[in-house]
């Protein structure tokens, strides 16, 4: 909205209006505005949730400080969503297909999470939406994103970007714009993997098979990352802080992918138009950081499924549309580890019960952040006993953030490793 207004004013040579043409300027504004919005509206939304008794139901799992959380308002993810949408609607180019995809993702998963939280908190059905309905909604979003990336003529990229310096002149060369199924992967030749290579056995209809594979991978990633963020949301500030760290890296990747010079230097695909996503990423980071104002230990509000499902879905779709989705296992290492710990725990328990008649566990409790939170006696049916003493919640969260920062730095660094 404001972008269109100031673009018009700049054509009339109004002083200062040209600043809005710069993505960097609008990104700084977007971050600042989302941070301020999430801090200021947070108190009002928390009071509203308290008045309507939208408190979290806490199961007693024997964790330190758990009972004190009883009655803390949930559904605070509304704060994050509002703080993302307002700056993006004001400052981003709303005609940009990448921005539109991110708005669809935010609203789609926000509605899904809101329904789930309302069922659990307001209508007092603690199970919420059934897992099948959640998966169907996430798969539906993945299909929409994958098909739009495939069908939209506005989503193209330039491969093999090179900038040569000859004397005082620079020569830029790249392939013609094309619909590409390439994605960035560290340690591969030219840092790229083409999904087309995985369908080489399809002599007929290879192009169609490649795009079907891409859409299926999109569906899987959206579902996996969204649920991974949901599992991570068990400690005050953990998901919001981790998401902010991831958002910074995604914003950087979008910016360099839309810049010919950086794309050539890093040997990654040049994706015209995706630089506008930097404005969205800035709002995303600002909203998460502003939410921490209320959600840091001890939390005044929990984000609920409306927050965690939305944050995970945003991260997944963002990475997919800038063709960096295979960097997510490293970048989202915290989410990945949380999900993996649950799968390992369940699989080993079933295996050991079938084998010995007594189910054994790898961890004291999953997701894995609860393993560190739970101290106490040495149980014979738990393989990993350490730490024997419970680690304070705030210390676990900060340590996970530090690991997230390390993984984020490694993700960026790997772009230059051949």
UniProtKB/Swiss-Prot annotation:
Q: Provide the reaction this enzyme catalyses.
A: UDP-N-acetyl-alpha-D-muramoyl-L-alanyl-gamma-D-glutamyl-meso-2,6-diaminopimeloyl-D-alanyl-D-alanine + di-trans,octa-cis-undecaprenyl phosphate = di-trans,octa-cis-undecaprenyl diphospho-N-acetyl-alpha-D-muramoyl-L-alanyl-D-glutamyl-meso-2,6-diaminopimeloyl-D-alanyl-D-alanine + UMP
Instruction: Name any cofactors this protein relies on.
Output: Mg(2+)
Keyword tags:
Cell cycle, Cell division, Cell inner membrane, Cell membrane, Cell shape, Cell wall biogenesis/degradation, Magnesium, Membrane, Metal-binding, Peptidoglycan synthesis, Transferase, Transmembrane, Transmembrane helix
- Group of enzyme by EC: transferase
Q: Which GO terms describe its biological process?
A: cell division; cell wall organization; peptidoglycan biosynthetic process; regulation of cell shape
**GO MF annotation, one:** phospho-N-acetylmuramoyl-pentapeptide-transferase activity
Cellular compartments per GO CC: plasma membrane
| Organism superkingdom | Bacteria
Topology of the protein relative to the lipid bilayer = Multi-pass membrane protein
- What CDD domains would the database entry show? GT_MraY
Q: What is its EC number?
A: 2.7.8.13
Q: Give the matching NCBIfam families.
A: mraY (TIGR00445)
Summarizing the function annotation, the protein's role is:
Catalyzes the initial step of the lipid cycle reactions in the biosynthesis of the cell wall peptidoglycan: transfers peptidoglycan precursor phospho-MurNAc-pentapeptide from UDP-MurNAc-pentapeptide onto the lipid carrier undecaprenyl phosphate, yielding undecaprenyl-pyrophosphoryl-MurNAc-pentapeptide, known as lipid I.
* Family, as annotated: Belongs to the glycosyltransferase 4 family. MraY subfamily.
**Which named protein is this?**
Phospho-N-acetylmuramoyl-pentapeptide-transferase
What species was this sequence derived from? Azobacteroides pseudotrichonymphae genomovar. CFP2
């Amino acid at each position: 909205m404001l972008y269109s207004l100031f673009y018009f004013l700049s054509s009339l040579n109004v002083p200062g209006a040209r600043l809005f043409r710069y993505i960097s300027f609008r990104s700084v504004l977007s971050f600042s505005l989302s941070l301020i919005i999430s801090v200021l509206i947070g108190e009002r939304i928390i009071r509203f949730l308290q008045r309507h008794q939208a408190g979290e139901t806490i199961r007693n799992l024997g964790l330190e400080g758990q009972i004190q959380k009883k009655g803390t308002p949930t559904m605070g993810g509304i704060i994050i969503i509002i703080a993302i949408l307002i700056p993006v609607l004001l400052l981003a180019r709303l005609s940009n297909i990448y921005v539109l995809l991110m708005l669809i993702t935010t609203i789609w998963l926000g509605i899904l999470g809101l329904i789930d939280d309302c069922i659990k908190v307001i209508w007092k059905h603690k199970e919420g939406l059934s897992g099948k309905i959640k998966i169907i909604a996430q798969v539906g979003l993945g299909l929409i994103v994958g098909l739009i990336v495939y069908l939209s003529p506005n989503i193209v990229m330039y491969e093999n970007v090179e900038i040569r310096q000859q004397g005082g002149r620079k020569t830029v060369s790249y392939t013609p714009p094309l619909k590409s199924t390439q994605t960035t992967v560290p340690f591969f030749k030219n840092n790229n993997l083409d999904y087309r290579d995985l369908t080489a056995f399809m002599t007929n209809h290879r192009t169609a098979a490649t795009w079907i594979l891409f859409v299926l991978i999109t569906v899987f990633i959206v579902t996996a990352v969204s649920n991974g963020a949901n599992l991570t949301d068990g400690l005050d500030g953990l998901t919001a802080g981790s998401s902010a760290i991831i958002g910074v890296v995604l914003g950087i990747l979008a910016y360099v992918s839309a810049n010919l010079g950086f794309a050539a230097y890093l040997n990654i695909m040049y994706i015209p138009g995706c630089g506008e996503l930097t404005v969205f990423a800035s709002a995303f980071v600002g909203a998460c950081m502003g939410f921490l104002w209320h959600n840091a230990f001890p939390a005044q509000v929990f984000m609920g499924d409306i927050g965690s499902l939305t944050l995970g879905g945003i991260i997944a779709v963002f990475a997919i549309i800038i063709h960096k989705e295979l960097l997510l296992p490293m970048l989202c290492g915290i989410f990945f580890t949380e999900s993996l710990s649950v799968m390992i725990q369940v699989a080993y328990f079933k295996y050991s019960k079938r084998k010995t008649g007594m189910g054994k566990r790898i961890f004291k409790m999953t997701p894995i952040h609860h393993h560190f939170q739970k101290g106490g006696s040495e149980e014979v049916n738990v393989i990993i006993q350490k730490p024997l003493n419970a680690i304070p919640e705030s210390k676990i969260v900060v340590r996970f953030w530090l690991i997230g920062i390390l993984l984020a730095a490694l993700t960026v660094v790997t772009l230059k490793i051949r």
